[in-house]
UniProtKB/Swiss-Prot annotation:
The lineage of its organism: Bacteria, Pseudomonadati, Pseudomonadota, Betaproteobacteria, Rhodocyclales. GO terms for cellular component: cytosol. The gene is hfq. This is RNA-binding protein Hfq. Gene3D superfamilies: 2.30.30.100. PANTHER family: RNA-BINDING PROTEIN HFQ. It holds the Pfam family Hfq. One of its GO terms (biological process) is regulation of translation, ncRNA-mediated. NCBIfam families: Hfq, PRK00395.1.
Length: 81
């Protein structure tokens, strides 16, 4: 995965995790999963609802927070592009 992908992805997922924001995760096959992000790494997201599911990032199409979030980025040297 490119460095730029991590610069966007990690702060977004980390904010959702830290603030316990409920999310809907849509998979590439159309299935909708709901819960809170418990943890994540380069390849997977742990999604907690009644149970914790390990969801592979390559299967994720879209992550939709239940409310607006402000992404805390470490390095603000790069603009939106």
């Amino acid at each position: 995965m490119s460095n730029k992908g991590q610069l966007l992805q990690d702060p977004f997922l980390n904010t959702l995790r830290r603030e316990h924001v409920p999310v809907a995760i849509y998979l590439v096959n159309g299935i909708k999963l709901q819960g809170q992000i418990e943890s994540f790494d380069q390849y997977v997201v742990l999604l907690k609802n009644t149970v914790t599911q390990m969801v592979y990032k390559h299967a994720i199409s879209t992550v939709v927070p239940a409310r607006p979030v402000n992404i805390q980025q470490q390095d603000s040297g790069e603009g939106n592009s």
